[in-house]
């Protein structure tokens, strides 16, 4: 928007650099809850269970490897669609970056509800504004503004 109003303004350049270098990384950090290790597990928390007699009545097989489930197999249900897979079959699928169930293509992860209260939203916007003003003063001192 600023670039449309002031196409050759240093303020436009400062706003774009600020948004790219500060707002986007801070937004990602806030989205991850401030956890630096959030990318390590990609948010997949599968609960493994042992395949038992209750499931055996259905005589079903793993949709990935097409091998029938047997007693004591390590299996898991995907959280949203509840499809059953061998853990050793579904983990490589998810770790390769697939975000959907290989059977029905529904998203694996349920959207997380926002847990941020109004005070946190206000303080983060205040942080963004103060960083922006500091950045503008810095550019002014360097002679760009």
From Swiss-Prot:
GO terms for molecular function: transferase activity; zinc ion binding. The keyword Plastid does not apply. The keyword Metal-binding applies. A zinc finger (RING-type) spans 62-105. One of its GO terms (biological process) is protein ubiquitination. InterPro entries: Znf_RING (IPR001841), Znf_RING/FYVE/PHD (IPR013083). GO terms for cellular component: membrane. Its EC number is 2.3.2.27. Residues 1-29 form the signal peptide. It is found in: Membrane. Pfam families: zf-RING_2. Pathway: Protein modification; protein ubiquitination. SUPFAM superfamilies: RING/U-box. The chain crosses the membrane at residues 125-145. It catalyses: S-ubiquitinyl-[E2 ubiquitin-conjugating enzyme]-L-cysteine + [acceptor protein]-L-lysine = [E2 ubiquitin-conjugating enzyme]-L-cysteine + N(6)-ubiquitinyl-[acceptor protein]-L-lysine. It comes from the Eukaryota. Keywords: Membrane, Metal-binding, Signal, Transferase, Transmembrane, Transmembrane helix, Ubl conjugation pathway, Zinc, Zinc-finger. It is a single-pass membrane protein. The RING-type zinc finger domain mediates binding to an E2 ubiquitin-conjugating enzyme. PANTHER family: RING ZINC FINGER PROTEIN-RELATED, RING-TYPE DOMAIN-CONTAINING PROTEIN. Belongs to the RING-type zinc finger family. ATL subfamily. This is RING-H2 finger protein ATL18. It comes from Arabidopsis thaliana. The lineage of its organism: Eukaryota, Viridiplantae, Streptophyta, Embryophyta, Tracheophyta. The gene is ATL18.
